[in-house]
């Protein structure tokens, strides 16, 4: 996308955003890649904007940068729940979680898993605890005893009609 004439959201990101949106949750999109933001601008944005949950992801080749981003989020907002998806966390979840300060790694398709995480946090007085996500499929985390936990894989999505038409106007 960088340098491309056509700047579009990745399909996966747009699908997750649409799914969260139609279930009544507000969010801000800060698309670092499409806007080619410098690290300093990203850090300033994070410093000046507090969120309960921050979700982000990339391909595994951006591992080092995603670790940096996670560190910056936790540096300014240690209680913010960080959820990381795509292959950067899903392909190497234990390595990623043990070597970053991220809270949750998404494994596989994210729409249902992310919504269930948000609902669990919302229903727990907006407080993240590992105990509230242990039964959610399609994720990994490090529990309070330092044990790596990977939950049951989410069953393949069978009917696209169960999902809303992707919105592209975010």
Role assignments for model-derived ranges:
Residues 161-170:
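Radical SAM [4Fe-4S] cluster-binding motif and immediate context
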């Amino acid at each position: 996308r960088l340098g491309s004439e056509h700047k579009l959201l990745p399909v996966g990101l747009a699908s997750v955003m649409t799914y969260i949106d139609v279930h009544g949750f507000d969010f801000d999109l800060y698309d670092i890649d499409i806007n080619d933001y410098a690290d300093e601008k990203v850090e300033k944005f994070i410093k000046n904007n507090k969120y309960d949950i921050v979700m982000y992801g990339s391909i595994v080749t951006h591992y080092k940068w995603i670790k940096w981003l996670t560190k910056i989020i936790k540096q300014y907002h240690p209680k913010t729940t960080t959820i990381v998806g795509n292959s950067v966390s899903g392909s190497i979840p234990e390595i990623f979680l043990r070597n970053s300060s991220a809270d949750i790694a998404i494994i596989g398709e994210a729409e249902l898993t992310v919504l269930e995480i948000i609902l669990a946090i919302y229903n727990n007085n907006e407080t993240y605890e590992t105990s509230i996500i242990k039964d959610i499929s399609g994720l990994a985390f490090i529990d309070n005893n330092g044990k790596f936990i990977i939950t049951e894989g989410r069953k393949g999505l069978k009917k696209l009609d169960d999902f809303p038409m992707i919105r592209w106007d975010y």
